[in-house]
Curated annotation (Swiss-Prot):
Compartment(s) of residence: Cytoplasm; Mitochondrion outer membrane
One Pfam family linked to the record: Thg1
Function: Adds a GMP to the 5'-end of tRNA(His) after transcription and RNase P cleavage. This step is essential for proper recognition of the tRNA and for the fidelity of protein synthesis. Also functions as a guanyl-nucleotide exchange factor/GEF for the MFN1 and MFN2 mitofusins thereby regulating mitochondrial fusion. By regulating both mitochondrial dynamics and bioenergetic function, it contributes to cell survival following oxidative stress.
Protein's name in the database: Probable tRNA(His) guanylyltransferase
Source organism: Homo sapiens (Human)
Associated clinical condition: Spinocerebellar ataxia, autosomal recessive, 28: A form of spinocerebellar ataxia, a clinically and genetically heterogeneous group of cerebellar disorders due to degeneration of the cerebellum with variable involvement of the brainstem and spinal cord. SCAR28 patients manifest mild motor developmental delay, gait ataxia, and dysarthria. Some patients show mildly impaired intellectual development. Disease onset is in early childhood.
Binding of GTP, residues: 58-63, 104-105
GO biological process: mitochondrial fusion; protein homotetramerization; response to oxidative stress; stress-induced mitochondrial fusion; tRNA modification; tRNA processing
Keyword S-adenosyl-L-methionine: no
Amino acid sequence: MWGACKVKVHDSLATISITLRRYLRLGATMAKSKFEYVRDFEADDTCLAHCWVVVRLDGRNFHRFAEKHNFAKPNDSRALQLMTKCAQTVMEELEDIVIAYGQSDEYSFVFKRKTNWFKRRASKFMTHVASQFASSYVFYWRDYFEDQPLLYPPGFDGRVVVYPSNQTLKDYLSWRQADCHINNLYNTVFWALIQQSGLTPVQAQGRLQGTLAADKNEILFSEFNINYNNELPMYRKGTVLIWQKVDEVMTKEIKLPTEMEGKKMAVTRTRTKPVPLHCDIIGDAFWKEHPEILDEDS
């Protein structure tokens, strides 16, 4: 009797197994419809292996955006701090980013050489970074512009470039910081001529046409008593974001076995987070101080 039951159970399981396999095969066949051929038109945008992947974002038409939202000239610390907050959010979301650099309305994000995020597809790198950054800009706006409502959503365009060596990556970041210095020096003199000397924008532009860096420094010092080297490093050098260990103090409720109610106590914990620095990255000192950034296994 028991033997007969075992045979029936075994036969039933075998029947169920055969039926299940048929349904799975049918599902797989249905999933591959006649329309699936359109996937063949997708371009292969895989980034080269063993190269640094850099995503650079730029604000779209930010001159108009800055005017509409009453940004301070030549620099608005609120706007720069908001940009950095957005960049930190991107780095915390995409942890394969080893360093970021930002100035004015742009930010560059460097993914480690061995990253395999998004199967190294350039379109995925660019769209994930751009969407996370833009949504963060809107989300955190009120934290930095309490009295200025956001009149319309900002836009950011992005591009992806791969750099084959440590030196080319360092040269890229040096280029962006040099660009920060050139633009900020010009803007500092330009707006001093307008705000303090009463020149029109056209007149200020004409005054600065053909001048060198030394000439601009001389105008600032002799006419406005401004030593450019004393301007905030955030304005002159931009912002570098790197991962560092930071001690954070938080309040936690601790309940001892002998007590009925818990007590709130300050607890210090250490975590790694993107930390902003305003320092020179063109020279070798920064890279010697932070060798882990270019480490293959960082």
